[in-house]
């Protein structure tokens, strides 16, 4: 028993942003085969994407904070094109992934997961540091342009066994796996971001223009390589109303940073770590589940991106630790979940010292509570909602300078509500409201405003020549709200009101 599913993509035209052209071609094939003893899935795909204009990324000039910049300028018109003639991003890539399971007997099986993907950013003509720099409260923009290429390749392989062991009334689901991953990046030997290929100037409210723009040819060189080896063991123990997960992962990693021009290694960072994972679930009755969990992950070391003054530097490896407790309650067609979590990870932040550097300074701690409710309100009416409070702070920073300050770009409040109406089996209407609270940036010196957006859509099920089809019309950002989304210290401009039509054929 098996099947083949093919998804194709062809885009060519303007988006909801003025003079923003997008062209894309893609094809993906998912092939699967199942029999009594095995299960195999193969995914292969290719995609090419070309975007002209329509830049959304901005930043504030760090040296002007508290001087020419005393506030975050109000978001400009989202439908305007804040690019210039020649601004472009073009990429192509492919993916191959294989998953196979083979039964050895009634209780044991072995499995193989392997894959690779490659992506080449062929053209990337944008403001230096990959965004446009706002220099004052009026929204004026001034910075150099840059042109770059990036080639990324990833390889992964995992081999393991999984089986069930019964010891009296206790059931063990045991998994042992070995895995290895390879990753490499090539970058432009010269990005021409020193003004030699031109500059961009203007204002976010009236538009931007490129000045003396020149498009150089780009040659790439090896920027970084890393390798990762790991072994993991996990045991899920089930006994009556209780379930216990015990797991551990041991890894070794090596990260090499290269001089793209000479091809020589400039820095090597090796690491190894033991990361435990454990969790507990207890179901006192058919409606209620109580849970608690702890997990640890290890970052092998962040390689500083080319837009920073310390590009190519490898930041120290660091662990991310997460703890969570909560409960789930299901009754009368509703599922309610409440979780309290704590996450600690390395604090990789932007630091301005004449130029912008990426540095590791202490840790980030995320503490929060998340509530979600979904279910059937009444006949033909469904509801889903969620609310999260997040307290994200910086700790253990150098000399305590930023201790207790909010992590840049982290909003304290987020909420979503979705309402669906199904007048009959063929037709449905869905509405969604999303709220994002205000967020501090630049270590609480500035703040982005809160915003709320609304989406509205309809679905209709029909048939063309006896082939089932679902027609969908969706309007995103229904009220055409203009807003900034904070991402670290960067500002991402919202997308304008966008109408999307689609048809899904069940062949």
Task: Map each language-model feature to its residues.
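Transmembrane beta-barrel wall of Gram-negative outer-membrane proteins
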Residues: 1-60, 88-99
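Repeated loop/turn-to-beta-strand initiation elements of outer-membrane beta-barrel proteins
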Residues: 2-4, 37-42, 107-110, 169, ...
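Transmembrane beta-barrel strands of outer-membrane/channel proteins
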Residues: 6-12, 42-48, 112-118, 176-182, ...
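Surface-exposed loop/turn segments flanking beta-strands in extracellular/periplasmic regions
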Residues: 61-77, 131-141, 188-220, 266-267, ...
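Membrane-embedded beta-barrel scaffold of Gram-negative outer-membrane proteins
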Residues: 99-103, 109-115, 119-127, 283, ...
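Conserved C-terminal beta-signal and adjacent last beta-strands/turns
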Residues: 150, 162, 173-174, 292, ...
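Structural signature of Gram-negative outer-membrane beta-barrels, strongest in the C-terminal barrel
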Residues: 152-154, 167-186, 220-345, 376, ...
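Gram-negative outer-membrane beta-barrel transporters
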Residues: 241, 340-344, 360-443, 479, ...
């Amino acid at each position: 028993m098996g099947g083949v599913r093919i998804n194709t993509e062809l885009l060519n035209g303007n988006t909801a942003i003025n003079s923003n052209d997008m062209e894309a071609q893609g094809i993906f094939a998912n092939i699967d085969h199942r029999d009594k003893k095995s299960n195999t899935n193969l995914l292969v795909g290719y995609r090419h994407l070309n975007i002209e204009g329509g830049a959304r990324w901005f930043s504030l000039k760090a040296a002007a904070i508290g001087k020419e910049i005393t506030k975050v300028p109000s978001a400009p018109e989202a439908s305007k094109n804040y690019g210039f003639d020649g601004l472009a991003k073009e990429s192509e890539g492919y993916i191959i992934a294989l998953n196979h399971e083979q039964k050895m007997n009634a209780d044991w099986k072995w499995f193989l997961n392997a894959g690779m993907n490659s992506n080449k950013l062929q053209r990337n003509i944008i403001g230096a540091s990959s965004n446009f720099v706002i220099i004052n409260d009026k929204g004026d923009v001034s910075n150099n342009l840059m042109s770059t290429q990036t080639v990324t390749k990833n390889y992964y392989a995992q081999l393991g066994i999984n089986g069930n062991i019964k010891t009296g009334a206790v059931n063990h689901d045991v998994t042992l796996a070995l895995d290895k991953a390879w990753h490499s990046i090539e970058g432009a030997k010269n990005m021409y971001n020193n003004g030699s290929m031109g500059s961009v100037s203007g204002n976010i409210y009236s538009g931007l223009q490129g000045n003396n723009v020149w498009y150089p040819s780009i040659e790439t060189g090896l920027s970084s390589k890393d390798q990762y080896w790991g072994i993991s063991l996990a045991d899920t123990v089930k006994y009556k109303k209780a379930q216990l997960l015990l797991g551990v992962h041991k890894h070794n990693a090596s990260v090499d940073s290269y001089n793209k021009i000479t091809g020589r290694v400039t820095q090597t960072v090796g690491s190894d770590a033991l990361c435990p994972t454990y969790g507990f679930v207890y179901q006192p009755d058919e409606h209620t589940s109580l849970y608690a969990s702890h997990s640890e992950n290890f970052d092998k070391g962040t390689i500083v991106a080319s837009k920073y003054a310390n590009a190519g530097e490898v930041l120290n490896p660091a662990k991310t630790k997460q703890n969570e407790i909560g409960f789930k309650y299901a009754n009368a067609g509703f599922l309610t979940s409440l979780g309290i979590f704590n996450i600690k990870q390395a604090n990789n932040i932007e630091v301005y010292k004449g130029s912008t550097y990426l540095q590791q300074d202490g840790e980030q701690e995320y503490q929060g509570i998340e509530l979600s409710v979904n279910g059937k309100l009444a006949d033909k009416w469904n509801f889903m909602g969620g609310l999260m409070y997040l307290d994200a702070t910086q700790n253990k920073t150098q000399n305590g300078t930023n201790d207790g300050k909010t992590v840049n770009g982290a909003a304290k409040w987020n909420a979503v509500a979705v309402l669906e109406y199904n007048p009959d089996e063929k037709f449905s209407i869905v509405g969604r409201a999303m709220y994002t609270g205000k967020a501090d940036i630049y270590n609480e010196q500035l703040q982005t405003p809160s915003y709320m957006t609304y989406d509205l859509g309809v679905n209709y099920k029909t048939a063309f020549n006896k082939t089932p089809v679902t027609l969908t019309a969706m309007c995103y950002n229904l009220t055409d709200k203009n807003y900034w989304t904070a991402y670290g210290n960067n500002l991402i401009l919202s997308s304008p009101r966008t109408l999307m039509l689609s048809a899904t054929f069940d062949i």
